[in-house]
């Protein structure tokens, strides 16, 4: 199933016929996809649907068995890695470090592709730690942080990495709210939303359908490695579609203030 194309957004990323098979299991089954600048695209689906596999193929962590990827109309393989790092940032679900860095040093790692001075890197990382709300953790040892704190420090790192991306910016988030409390879930997604409003293409793997409906411009439901639905939250989150994919009956109502769909299970 091919993606829908909006006429007033440029294509940031285009994937054609992506096929991925690991251990004899098909994880992606000839997926075609166009990701637009200036939008948040949420990848949804049950466990094992192919969401994280798709994100890892798109960001180059996993090489597909077949298919092609273009980033800003240029084949992904033609991008020098250091140049691509300025324009595409990835926040994985789990980030591990084997050294006892201070939290601000982790955030400063994002400046490595930017060719700026150490002082500029420190200032940039400090600014993004404030934005994410982890500036009070700057001098804490990274291994002593909670899972949610680590995730937010890495978000500051990714924002630092993309600081010089200009108009060509892709942000990929793999379950960015999984370790966060309610307030930090919304704060993280508000930052992603602000970036998209500035022109970035944002791709989020997320399980919470209500958060996806609230913040994403476009929802893509995957199941068994295929795109099952693709459109606006109201187009995608119908009771029938949700029950068919997740195997659970739901009701869908409109949020009383903001009119996005709310799922009641």
Curated annotation (Swiss-Prot):
ATP binds at residues 45-52. InterPro entries: AAA+_ATPase, ABC_transporter-like_ATP-bd, P-loop_NTPase. It is a peripheral membrane protein. GO terms for cellular component: plasma membrane. Gene3D superfamilies: P-loop containing nucleotide triphosphate hydrolases. PANTHER family: HEMIN IMPORT ATP-BINDING PROTEIN HMUV. Part of the ABC transporter complex HmuTUV involved in hemin import. Responsible for energy coupling to the transport system. One of its GO terms (molecular function) is ATP binding. This is Hemin import ATP-binding protein HmuV. Disulfide bonds: none annotated. Belongs to the ABC transporter superfamily. Heme (hemin) importer (TC 3.A.1.14.5) family. The gene is hmuV. PROSITE patterns: ABC_TRANSPORTER_2, HMUV. Residues 13-249 form the ABC transporter domain. It is an enzyme of class 7 (translocase). The lineage of its organism: Bacteria, Pseudomonadati, Pseudomonadota, Gammaproteobacteria, Vibrionales. SMART domains: AAA. Keywords: ATP-binding, Cell inner membrane, Cell membrane, Membrane, Nucleotide-binding, Translocase, Transport. It is found in: Cell inner membrane. Its EC number is 7.6.2.-. It comes from Photobacterium damselae subsp. damselae (Listonella damsela). The keyword Membrane applies. The complex is composed of two ATP-binding proteins (HmuV), two transmembrane proteins (HmuU) and a solute-binding protein (HmuT). NCBIfam families: PRK13548.1 (NF010068).
């Amino acid at each position: 199933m091919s993606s829908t194309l909006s006429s007033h957004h440029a294509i940031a990323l285009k994937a054609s016929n992506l096929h991925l098979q690991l251990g004899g299991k098909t994880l992606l089954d000839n997926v075609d996809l166009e990701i637009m600048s200036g939008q948040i695209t949420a990848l949804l689906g049950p466990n094992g649907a192919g969401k994280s596999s798709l994100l890892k193929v798109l960001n180059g962590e996993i090489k597909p068995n077949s298919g092609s990827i273009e980033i800003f109309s240029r084949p992904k393989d033609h991008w020098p890695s250091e140049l691509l790092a300025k324009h595409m940032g990835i926040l994985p679900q789990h980030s591990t470090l084997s050294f006892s860095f201070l939290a601000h040093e982790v955030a400063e790692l994002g400046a490595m592709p930017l060719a700026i001075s150490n002082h500029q890197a420190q200032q940039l990382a400090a600014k993004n730690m404030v934005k994410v709300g982890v500036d009070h953790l700057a001098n804490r040892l990274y291994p002593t942080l909670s899972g949610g704190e680590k995730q937010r420090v890495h978000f500051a790192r990714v924002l630092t990495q993309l600081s010089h991306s200009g108009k060509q910016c892709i942000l990929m988030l793999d379950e960015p709210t999984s370790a966060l409390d309610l307030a930090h879930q919304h704060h993280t997604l508000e930052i992603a939303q602000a970036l998209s409003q500035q022109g970035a293409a944002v791709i989020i793997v997320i399980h919470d359908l209500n958060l996806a409906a609230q913040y994403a411009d476009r929802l893509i439901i995957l199941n068994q490695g295929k795109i099952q639905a693709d459109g606006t939250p109201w187009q995608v989150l119908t009771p029938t579609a949700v029950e068919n994919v997740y195997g659970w009956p739901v009701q869908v109502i409109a949020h009383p203030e903001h009119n996005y769909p709310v799922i009641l299970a």
